């Protein structure tokens, strides 16, 4: 019988989550697909010049994740990159739009839960 080799090399990671953002996950995914696997400084520069509303949410969240990495995990900011970033749907607010002849259509105000995971490059 062979002994199990213990490869306990724990990788430090810093996360930040924005919950209940009043924007559709589909609209945020357009922005987050542009910065996935990029270094954080490059990602911030990209977000600064994207003329989409979702970019403001993601930029603020990324700055929060960088602060978490620096203060809570003592990580080097220059080596950080975006390992994971995703937007999932949150609860929908349902509203009514009155239509002709007493009908009503449903308006779905979608919310998002956006998560960023940062890791250090070797």
Curated annotation (Swiss-Prot):
SUPFAM superfamilies: Ribosomal protein L22. PROSITE patterns: RIBOSOMAL_L22. Keywords: Ribonucleoprotein, Ribosomal protein, RNA-binding, rRNA-binding. InterPro entries: Ribosomal_uL22, Ribosomal_uL22_bac/chlpt-type, Ribosomal_uL22_bac/org-type, Ribosomal_uL22_CS, Ribosomal_uL22_sf. One of its GO terms (cellular component) is cytosolic large ribosomal subunit. One of its GO terms (biological process) is translation. GO terms for molecular function: rRNA binding; structural constituent of ribosome. Belongs to the universal ribosomal protein uL22 family. Part of the 50S ribosomal subunit. This protein binds specifically to 23S rRNA; its binding is stimulated by other ribosomal proteins, e.g. L4, L17, and L20. It is important during the early stages of 50S assembly. It makes multiple contacts with different domains of the 23S rRNA in the assembled 50S subunit and ribosome. The globular domain of the protein is located near the polypeptide exit tunnel on the outside of the subunit, while an extended beta-hairpin is found that lines the wall of the exit tunnel in the center of the 70S ribosome. NCBIfam families: rplV_bact (TIGR01044). This is Large ribosomal subunit protein uL22.
């Amino acid at each position: 019988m062979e002994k199990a080799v213990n490869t306990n090399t724990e990788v430090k990671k810093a996360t930040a989550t924005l919950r209940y953002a009043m924007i559709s996950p589909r609209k945020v995914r357009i922005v987050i697909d542009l910065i996935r696997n990029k270094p954080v400084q490059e990602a911030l520069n990209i977000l600064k010049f994207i003329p989409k509303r979702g970019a403001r949410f993601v930029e603020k969240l990324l700055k929060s994740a960088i602060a978490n990495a620096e203060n809570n995990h003592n990580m080097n900011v220059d080596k950080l990159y975006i390992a994971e970033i995703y937007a999932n749907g949150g609860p929908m607010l349902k509203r009514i739009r009155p239509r002709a002849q007493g009908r009503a259509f449903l308006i779905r105000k979608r919310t998002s839960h956006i998560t960023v995971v940062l890791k250090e490059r070797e």
